[in-house]
Amino acid sequence: MNEYLLLLISTVLVNNFVLVKFLGLCPFMGVSSKLESAIGMSMATTFVLTLASILSYLVNQYLLLPFDLSYLRTMSFILVIAVVVQFTEMVVQKTSAALHRALGIYLPLITTNCAVLGVALLNVNEKHDFIQSAIFGFGAALGFSLVLILFSAMRERLAAADVPLPFKGGAIAMITAGLMSLAFMGFTGLVK
């Protein structure tokens, strides 16, 4: 139990996929201008990352490894991710049309979010079992969501602030992301 808790904490805080591994930067910068869309994207990405992590583990263990098809790992994981994203898009469209419109193109772009594929591939490389894969995927999703929501809240405050003209827009966003990354470096010694 303690091992699973450490894996979750390390994935969320210490080895955050956005701020430490620099994966998932496209939605991080693209959807973070409004808090409402960032929360929706966080929920969708959490669902996709967790489910894709679990399904990728199952595909790898029960299809690719027994038939010695490990060379198809990346392609099969992309296929799994695409199916999960399409399922998520259908669910979001049926349950909340406003959220579907707010997320726009970023919802189908979860398919190309390198963090989702990165989690699936890292599960294999780190030889996680089923429960560890689920926790790793969920932790990565929580870390992504935490950073996206915090960053979105800061960007909304910066939009109303008196920022010097050369720093408006993307420049101040990059500076803020860098400062967030430095803040998350403080968690480095938390988990070994």
From Swiss-Prot:
It is a multi-pass membrane protein. The chain crosses the membrane at residues 5-25, 39-59, 65-85, 102-122, 134-154, 171-191. One of its GO terms (cellular component) is plasma membrane. GO terms for biological process: electron transport chain. Signal peptide: none annotated. The keyword Cell membrane applies. Keywords: Cell inner membrane, Cell membrane, Electron transport, Membrane, Translocase, Transmembrane, Transmembrane helix, Transport. It is found in: Cell inner membrane. It comes from the Bacteria. Its EC number is 7.-.-.-. InterPro entries: Ion_transpt_RnfA/RsxA (IPR011293), NqrDE/RnfAE (IPR003667), NqrDE/RnfAE_oxidrdctase (IPR050133). The complex is composed of six subunits: RnfA, RnfB, RnfC, RnfD, RnfE and RnfG. Part of a membrane-bound complex that couples electron transfer with translocation of ions across the membrane. This is Ion-translocating oxidoreductase complex subunit A. It comes from Shewanella baltica (strain OS223). The gene is rnfA.
